[in-house]
C-alpha cells in the first residue's frame, strides 16, 4: 500500500508540473510532449508521466498518440469565448460574495501587482515584458477569484486557465491594450477600494474590451 500511495503521489506531482507548464505558457497549445523526454526531464520513470497525461486527456487538454507522445490541444474559437465568459462570471461572483467589503490583505497584494504592472513600462525587452505581463495578469485575476474564499471556485478557475491560458489571450490583445493595460487594472482596484458597486461594471467592461480586441486581432477561426 505504501508503494501505491507513493506512486500516486508521484503521478500527482507530475500532473501538477504539467498543469503549471501549460497554464504559464511554457508548454504551448499544439506542442508535442514526449513521454520519454518528460520522464527524463523530471528524473522519473515513464509510468507517472503516462498516467498524468491520461488525466489531462480525460480533461480534454491533450491527445495521446502512439509512439509515446501526445499533443496539447489547440482550443477552438468557441472554447476560448466560452472560457472567457466563464472567467468573467466567476470573478463577478467572487466580488458579490464580499458584499462590498474586501480583505485589506487582498487589496494590498493587488496594489503590489498593479505597482509591478506600472513598473513594467520601463522594461526594454519586449519578450520579457510580455512574459511578465502575462504572469501579473494571472496574479491579479487570481486574487479577484480568491476574494470569494471558495476552494472549488479557485479550482474551477485554474481549470479554465488550463484550457485557455493568459498567454493565448495576450498574443492577440496585449500589443493593442499595452498603453492602457496597467491603468485598466488600477481602475478596477480603485473601485474595489472606493466604489465596490461600480467595480462589477468595470470588470465586465474590462472583459468585454479584451474579447473584442481578441476578435479584431485575428482570434483563432476554428469553430
Regions found by a protein language model. Name each.
Residues 90-121:
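Amphipathic alpha-helical dimerization/coiled-coil segments
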Residues 21, 26, 120, 124, ...:
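Hydrophobic side-chain positions on well-ordered alpha-helices
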Residues 118, 169-223:
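C-terminal all-alpha effector/ligand-binding and dimerization domain
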Residues 1-100, 211, 215-223:
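Short linear motifs at protein or domain termini
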Residues 86-102, 138-175, 213-214:
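Hydrophobic, amphipathic alpha-helical faces that serve as interaction scaffolds
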Residues 90, 113-116, 120, 129-132, ...:
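Amphipathic coiled-coil alpha-helices
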Residues 83, 110, 133, 137, ...:
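Hydrophobic packing residues in well-ordered alpha-helices of helical domains and bundles
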Residues 79, 103-106, 125-133, 149, ...:
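Residue-level recognition of alpha-helical structural elements
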Amino acid at each position: 500500500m505504501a508503494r501505491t500511495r507513493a506512486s500516486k503521489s508521484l503521478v500527482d506531482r507530475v500532473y501538477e508540473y504539467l498543469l503549471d507548464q501549460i497554464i504559464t505558457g511554457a508548454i504551448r497549445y499544439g506542442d508535442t510532449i514526449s513521454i520519454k523526454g518528460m520522464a527524463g526531464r523530471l528524473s522519473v520513470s515513464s509510468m507517472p508521466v503516462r498516467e498524468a497525461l491520461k488525466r489531462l486527456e480525460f480533461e480534454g487538454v491533450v491527445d495521446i498518440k502512439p509512439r509515446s507522445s501526445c499533443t496539447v490541444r489547440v482550443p477552438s474559437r468557441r472554447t476560448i469565448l466560452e472560457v472567457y465568459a466563464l472567467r468573467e462570471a466567476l470573478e463577478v461572483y467572487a466580488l458579490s460574495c464580499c458584499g462590498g467589503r474586501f480583505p485589506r490583505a487582498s487589496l494590498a497584494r493587488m496594489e503590489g501587482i498593479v505597482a509591478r504592472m506600472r513598473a513594467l513600462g520601463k522594461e526594454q525587452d519586449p519578450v520579457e515584458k510580455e512574459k511578465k505581463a502575462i504572469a501579473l495578469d494571472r496574479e491579479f485575476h487570481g486574487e479577484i477569484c480568491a476574494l470569494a474564499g471558495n476552494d472549488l471556485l479557485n479550482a474551477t478557475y485554474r481549470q479554465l486557465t488550463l484550457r485557455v491560458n493568459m498567454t493565448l489571450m495576450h498574443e492577440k490583445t496585449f500589443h493593442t491594450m499595452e498603453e492602457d493595460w496597467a491603468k485598466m487594472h488600477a481602475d478596477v482596484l480603485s473601485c474595489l477600494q472606493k466604489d465596490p458597486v461600480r467595480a462589477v461594471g468595470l470588470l465586465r467592461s474590462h472583459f468585454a474590451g479584451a474579447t473584442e480586441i481578441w476578435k479584431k486581432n485575428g482570434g483563432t477561426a476554428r469553430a
